[in-house]
From Swiss-Prot:
Bilayer topology term: Lipid-anchor
Signal sequence annotation: 1-22
Protein name: Uncharacterized lipoprotein SAUSA300_0411
Keywords annotated in UniProt: Cell membrane, Lipoprotein, Membrane, Palmitate, Signal
N-palmitoyl cysteine lipid sites: C23
Length: 266
């Protein structure tokens, strides 16, 4: 009888031990599930703005709130800065770069910026840069400076930002990225292989002269806190470059920052 009681007690201890271990294990699994990988954190940080794409009417940004911190003055509704450029090196040591930057002030509901044309040499001696002032009204780009080159004028007036036609609803499907982190800045980078079947890639090929059939790399770069920062920035690059010494890429960014600056910043 005593033997049976000891056996029953021994079995009870074993079952209790298994139950406790099982609880700890499930708890650890739960904790790990809560802690996203850096890759997931980077994608989630970008998703805050990429989920708004495509922004077919840029004036919708006047009614969109962004990340706010202590850098914003009281009453400042903030400003959206949208940017797209296309960079291409037609010959070694020379980079041609064209694009536009537009600042949409939510306080005044006005949008001003410029279209830029840059030719950059490695030695910088003969580098060339020209800006053409623009504004946006009724979702239409209006050229404020006189432009003699008719083709350039048409490119400016018909310009579309990447964010106006890009669609990243399937951002979660980009996996197995190459992630690098610089804790001193801090800055975060993630690279993902894209497919030529990707709709964003097809859109870019239809709008820009991209002679290579090479599938591009999607590069995500963040300066500042992953959770958000008005002094940091995020940059998206779709890189079609064949090799290290050549450059063929589209860069896009959409950032929210204070519209009213401190006197010390001016």
């Amino acid at each position: 009888m005593r033997y049976l009681k000891k056996l029953a007690w021994f079995i009870s201890v074993i079952i209790l031990g298994i139950f406790i271990i099982g609880c700890d294990s499930s708890s650890d699994t739960g904790e790990k599930a809560k802690e996203d990988s850096k890759e997931e954190q980077i994608k989630k940080s970008f998703a805050k703005t990429l989920d708004m794409y495509p922004i077919k009417n840029l004036e919708d940004l006047y009614d969109k709130e962004g990340y706010r911190d202590s850098e914003f003055k009281k009453g400042d509704k903030g400003m959206w800065m949208i940017y797209t450029d296309f960079a291409k090196s037609n010959k070694p040591g020379v980079l041609d770069n064209e694009g536009m930057i537009l600042n949409l002030d939510r306080n005044t509901r006005t949008a001003k910026g410029y279209y830029f044309v840059d030719t950059i040499y490695d030695n910088h001696e003969n580098s060339y840069s020209k800006n053409y002032r623009v504004e946006m009204k009724n979702n239409k780009i209006i050229l404020l400076d006189k432009v003699e080159d008719q083709k350039l004028k048409e490119r400016i007036e018909n310009f579309k930002f990447f964010g106006q036609y890009a669609d990243f609803k399937s951002l979660k499907s980009y996996n197995n990225g190459d992630v690098s982190i610089n804790s001193n800045v801090p800055s975060y980078d993630a690279k993902f292989k894209m497919s030529n079947k990707d709709e964003n890639v097809k859109q870019l090929r239809s709008r820009y002269n991209i002679p290579t059939e090479k599938a591009p790399i999607l590069k995500m770069h963040i300066d500042g806190d992953l959770k958000g920062s008005s002094v940091g920035y995020k940059k998206l690059e779709i890189d079609f470059s064949k090799e290290e010494n050549s450059e063929l890429s589209v860069v896009d960014s959409l950032n929210f920052q204070p519209a009213k600056k401190n006197k010390d910043d001016e």
